[in-house]
Amino acid sequence: DKESEGLILLTSNGDIVNEILRAENKHEKEYHVAVNKPVTDEFLRGMARGVRIHNEMTLPCKTARLAKYGFRIVLTQGLNRQIRLMSAAFDYRVKQLRRVRIDNLKLGALKPGQWRNLTEVELRGLLPQRTDW
């Protein structure tokens, strides 16, 4: 989603990307989201239960309020524009969407446009069963 920002993994190994993105592998992706109106408990509960988008129900997820107009959501699936569509189902509009974590990898202090290589420890933590790095 070009209107989003934050942590992204760049690799030439498509198998690794597919392993991370497949919902059945339960890799967590955490986002911080700013919306156009106050975040309510009802909204957070509804998002956490799952929402019908793209003719399917999203998987249950974790949510928490970060600010009056902001929340955190942790997904294990990655449907196209998932958070925007889930929010829209409750009449919320996403104003800012930032991925801050993929499993054990955290965005930390990296600014837009900055990058760094993963450490061996991070690689092993991300996909411990893989040995072909």
Where are these regions (language model features)?
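Basic, flexible Lys/Arg- and Gly-enriched helix-loop patches that mediate nucleic-acid binding at interfaces
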Residues: 2-133
